[in-house]
Amino acid sequence: HPTNDFNYYIEIIKSIKKLLPNVHIQAFTPVEIVHFAKISQKSIYEVLTILQQAGLDSLPGGGAEILDDEIRAKICPNKANTQEWIETIKTAHKLGMKTNASELYGHIETIEQRLQHLFTLREIQDETHGFQAFISFPFHPQNTQLDNIKPITSYESLRFIAISRLVLDNIPHIKAFWMMLTLPIAQLALAFGADDLDGTVEEEQIIHAAGAKTGQKMTTAQLQKIITETGYTPVQRDSLYRKIK
């Protein structure tokens, strides 16, 4: 939000934790943490420490897009740069906060840049061991300034998930986000290296604004059925990948 100050977000975390003390709060991408640091004139370490003390438990891995500043300058010039994203992730890990990692592929990046992103994540994980999962997002060009780009194919998405599983052997889990991939491709992804069918979403606006036609809601029972149909055993987990049932 362009006008809210850092204290606004601190109070949100405190309020949630006060109301629901046993709930695990995963919030704020590295890009948002960098934004908080800039508007509060604090270091990334200070921002994360304050949020952790307020009740923040872990971070999602969003905003990574492609960790290459040449690409970032073209597709997301106002977001945190590569070094800021990496610094935020490493700092969170050093503070004992788990995070996820992500990648947006299928836009203007080269194959080499797409793969280098994976190797960068692998190097971070070798150092910090703080990533829980990797999730890749195929770019949806419709209704964007890059709407002339041919959408990535389902085959390319499945191949990239398989490559991710091979390269990121030090990251425990690979997600298949059905809302980005479509449900049939996410189901197939379970045979291509993914082990986390994500997720029971109530509402999603970003990719649907870019023309996605997938649904916006999936129940636990529906996900269990899809996993069972594929020949696997569904396991419900919490935010730290601990088995619930």
Regions found by a protein language model. Name each.
Residues K18, S40, K94, F119, ...:
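Auxiliary Fe-S-binding modules of radical SAM enzymes
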Residues H1-E103, H107-Q116, E123:
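Conserved Radical SAM active-site core
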